[in-house]
Curated annotation (Swiss-Prot):
Glycosylation site list: 45
GO cellular component terms attached to this protein's record: extracellular region
Domain Kazal-like: 6-56
Membrane-spanning residues: none
Keyword ATP-binding in record: no
Feature type site, description Reactive bond 3: 18-19
Gene Ontology MF terms in the entry: serine-type endopeptidase inhibitor activity
Compartments it resides in: Secreted
Alphabetized SMART domains for the sequence: KAZAL
Disulfides per UniProt: 8-38, 16-35, 24-56
Organism lineage: Eukaryota, Metazoa, Chordata, Craniata, Vertebrata
The protein's name in its UniProt record: Ovomucoid
Record keywords: Disulfide bond, Glycoprotein, Protease inhibitor, Repeat, Secreted, Serine protease inhibitor
Length: 56
């Protein structure tokens, strides 16, 4: 099973859109979109990973 990944190299960003395209993090939390998820990845110092696309 290949690991799912998202390119977060352009993050963090100061503001995210309200666009709803959910991603499920390795913390079993649903993030509303890539921006919200990538900001959380940066804050976690890389310990947070993408579990899968869609809600948890």
């Amino acid at each position: 099973l290949a690991a799912v990944s998202v390119d977060c190299s352009e993050y963090p960003k100061p503001a995210c859109t309200m666009e709803y395209r959910p991603l499920c993090g390795s913390d079993n939390k649903t993030y509303g979109n890539k921006c919200n998820f990538c900001n959380a990845v940066v804050e976690s110092n890389g310990t947070l990973n993408l579990s899968h696309f869609g809600t948890c």
